[in-house]
Design a protein with these regions (language model features):
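Histidine-centered metal-chelating micro-motifs
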Residues: 127-129, 134-138
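Active-site region of the double-stranded beta-helix
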Residues: 1-125, 139-147, 151-213
């Protein structure tokens, strides 16, 4: 799979590098967090939210909105699914990582998406990017099989269990995105080979992308 640097102009439609906030301490603390054999995501970690980066990112990057800082760590080389939010997400990498991204605008009317349209970018250690709200993404991937540690910043309350019942694919509302809603502020399309929960909408067409191929 062709992997471009995060500074390549091709990334501009997906996000931008953040260089106006000091995240040194965030990277340092992130390097003390666990790196399992699989992938673990924690939406909110007290030790990360106690750092100066919490206020700086809330004030500068999110325009004084309340935010949460967690992490996505582990070992991974596969796409498995794509998701998007109603807001930008910040990925702050304590290690090298690969981001596989696409465009929400390319989701078909039947709520499917062709993975051949996705691109991969290398996010170097000690680098943070804003991933725009319309950018399809999922868990980062490691470089050459190595583990990764990436802090994940989102508006507070994102990625928690839903409280309401939402429309299924056979509902009148299926023309909209409601069947994709998998958690608060999280719309998801899974791949049949992604090992997702049975409740996930499976709509990715094409290969379950592998960054090592």
């Amino acid at each position: 799979m062709n992997i471009l640097p995060i500074t390549d102009p091709a990334f501009r439609k997906y996000g931008r590098v953040i260089n106006n906030v000091d995240l040194t301490e965030l990277y340092d603390v992130m390097r003390t967090t666990p790196v399992p054999e699989g992938v673990v995501y924690e939406p909110s970690i007290e030790a990360l939210e106690a750092l100066p980066a919490m206020k700086a990112l809330s004030t500068v990057t999110y325009g004084e909105m309340p935010i949460q800082i967690g992490y996505c760590n582990g070992h991974n080389s596969l796409l498995n699914a794509v998701e998007y939010h109603r807001s930008s997400e910040i990925n702050a990498a304590a290690t090298d990582a690969i981001l596989v991204v696409g465009m929400q605008q390319d989701i078909e009317d039947d709520l499917t998406y062709d993975t051949a349209k996705m691109e991969a970018f290398l996010l170097p250690a000690n680098t943070a990017v804003e991933i725009y709200a319309t950018t399809l993404h999922y868990a980062p991937c490691g470089v050459n099989g190595a583990g990764f540690q990436v802090a994940i910043v989102l508006p507070r309350g994102t990625n928690y269990p839903l409280e309401e019942t939402h429309a299924g694919l056979d509902a009148v509302a299926a023309k909209n995105e409601d069947p994709l809603l998998a958690a608060t502020n999280k719309w998801l399309i899974g791949h049949a080979e992604g090992g997702l929960d049975a409740s996930a909408h499976i709509g990715l067409k094409g290969k379950n992308l592998n960054v090592n191929e």
